[in-house]
């Protein structure tokens, strides 16, 4: 909808004056970990990314974020100064602005003067699509990995711009629950997450508990939710040397609601979220050095981790489903994965790939754990119960042809590809004299067909294989090829042959 995604950066005025230099120093923790001594780390503030309400109708997180911003901006005293000096807090109050708007507009448009807890009241019954998803009806808390949505694209870009040591993901759950904070169920953790990161989660938990104890709110931990899928906010940080934490507050879904513990108010939900988030900040200040050292060690051990992996690289075939293969590579690059052209031919499983036929991804690079987490095929787990997502191998999701490389790929690495471009199509034979033929074998064929129809052209669909002379050469075409006539039979048609020529030249460039 063209609206900006907003976030606030909260830190001490002295840090604000030197903010970009502090960001660059923070990036060195992952880029040059062996140069970041403990003495250097002790001089750096911890960077934390605090995100709220990725599901728009789990609204209390946003209100808690506003309270936190006010507390940190307006507060004075030693405690506030200690927080601001030792942390750089990236606060995103609305992970999902469109979903939140749907929810807020429904509640405000259907509530009465007197609050009601009756679950049959209109205020409590949003119609489809509700507020959980974004404008395109996508669950943004499953999109940190595939990055298909504009909100996710901006969020992942911001994450890697700063590379925080901590990522908070604030949610709501059923009204009959209390308050959940991680750690989750011990046996349901992705094996690529280091034990040291899990240990830090356990060290943080008492800080959440203390703040909730202060206001006598009930809570629990370790009894639900998993950490398998790296496409959720609470787990995405785990595979980047950060610690991801999930908060879940019992939801009133409106100003107040009935629960098996009596009346639950929105104000109560906001208070719990605010206090637990303060607990997170308390813990980050107290454990700052441990978090910074953990991220440094996470990346310092990358080569060691890669050496233990039997897979030394992944090869992605560009000759099959080329557009989808390029889109996969583009997605991997969003997560700081290094990809390379082939320097020379390589043969894998009897298939020969020449330079230009494939892209190769070595596992010996800083993001080696992430590569394993999204490229390997895992079919057995210590605990086979999943919260929801149970498969996340990205090449399979994109439907591309890829291979494990078991030999060291150094000799085959060509130039590094910093930003892959999706290829354009080809217009073979120049201007058509009768019709254009569009084989149905490219990812964006449906987009092109829509634009052809929208221009007023009535194309035809072939129902059997055939041959045709193109540019003096006989070519074979499969069933499903689209025939785009130059002259329209429709007497009311206004599109001319020159307009058809111009559209075809445009489509091969823009729709690949």
PLM features per residue range, with description:
Residues 99, 175-176:
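Short, active-site-adjacent cap segments at secondary-structure transitions
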Residues 118-138:
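Aromatic- and acidic-residue-enriched carbohydrate-binding clefts of CAZyme catalytic domains
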Residues 69, 86-109, 114:
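Carboxylate/His-rich catalytic cores and anion/metal-binding grooves
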Residues 106-123, 145, 164, 202-203:
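Active-site cavity-forming subdomains of large catalytic enzyme subunits
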Residues 1-59, 63-90, 136, 142-143, ...:
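Intrinsic-disorder/low-complexity accessory segments
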Residues 172:
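Detector for the c-type heme attachment site
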């Amino acid at each position: 909808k063209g609206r900006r995604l907003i976030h606030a950066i909260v830190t001490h005025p002295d840090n604000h004056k030197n903010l970009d230099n502090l960001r660059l120093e923070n990036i060195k923790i992952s880029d040059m970990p062996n140069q970041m001594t403990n003495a250097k780390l002790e001089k750096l503030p911890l960077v934390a990314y605090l995100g709220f309400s990725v599901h728009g109708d789990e609204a209390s997180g946003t209100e808690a974020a506003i309270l936190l911003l006010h507390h940190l901006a307006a507060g004075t005293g030693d405690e506030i100064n200690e927080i601001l000096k030792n942390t750089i807090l990236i606060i995103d109050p609305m992970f999902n602005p469109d979903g939140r708007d749907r929810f807020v507009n429904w509640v405000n448009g259907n509530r009465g003067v007197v609050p009601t807890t009756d679950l049959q009241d209109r205020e409590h019954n949003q119609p489809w699509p509700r507020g959980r998803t974004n404008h395109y009806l996508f669950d943004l808390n499953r999109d940190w990995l595939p990055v298909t949505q504009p909100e996710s694209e901006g969020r992942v870009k911001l994450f890697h711009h700063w590379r925080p040591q901590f990522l908070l993901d604030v949610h709501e759950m059923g009204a009959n629950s209390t308050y959940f904070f991680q750690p989750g169920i011990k046996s349901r953790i992705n094996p690529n997450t280091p034990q040291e990161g899990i240990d830090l989660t356990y060290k943080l938990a008492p800080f959440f508990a203390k703040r909730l104890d202060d206001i006598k709110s009930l809570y629990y931990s370790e009894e639900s939710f998993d950490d398998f899928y790296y496409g959720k906010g609470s787990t995405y940080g785990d595979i980047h040397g950060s610690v991801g934490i999930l908060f879940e507050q019992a939801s009133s879904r409106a100003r107040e609601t009935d629960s098996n513990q009596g009346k639950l108010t929105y104000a109560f939900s906001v208070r719990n979220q605010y206090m637990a988030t303060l607990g997170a900040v308390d813990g980050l200040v107290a454990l700052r050095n441990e978090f910074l050292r953990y991220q440094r060690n996470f990346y310092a051990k990358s080569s060691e981790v890669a050496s233990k992996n039997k897979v030394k690289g992944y090869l992605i075939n560009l000759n099959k489903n080329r557009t989808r293969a390029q889109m996969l590579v583009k997605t991997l690059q969003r997560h700081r994965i290094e990809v390379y052209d082939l320097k020379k031919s390589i043969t894998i499983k009897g298939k020969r790939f020449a330079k230009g036929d494939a892209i190769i991804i070595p596992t010996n690079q800083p993001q080696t754990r992430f590569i394993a987490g999204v490229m390997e095929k895992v079919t057995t787990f210590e605990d086979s119960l999943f919260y929801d997502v149970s498969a996340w191998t990205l090449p399979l999701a994109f439907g591309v042809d890829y291979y494990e490389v078991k030999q060291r790929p150094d000799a085959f690495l060509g130039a590094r590809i910093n930003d892959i471009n999706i290829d354009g199509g080809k217009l073979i034979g120049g201007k058509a004299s009768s019709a254009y033929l569009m084989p149905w074998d490219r990812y964006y064929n449906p987009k092109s067909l829509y634009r052809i129809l929208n221009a007023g052209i009535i194309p035809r669909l072939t129902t059997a294989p055939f041959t045709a002379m193109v540019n003096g050469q006989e070519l074979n075409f499969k069933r499903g090829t689209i025939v785009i006539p130059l002259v329209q039979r429709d007497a009311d048609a206004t599109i001319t042959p020159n307009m058809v020529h111009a559209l075809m030249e445009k489509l091969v460039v823009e729709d690949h």
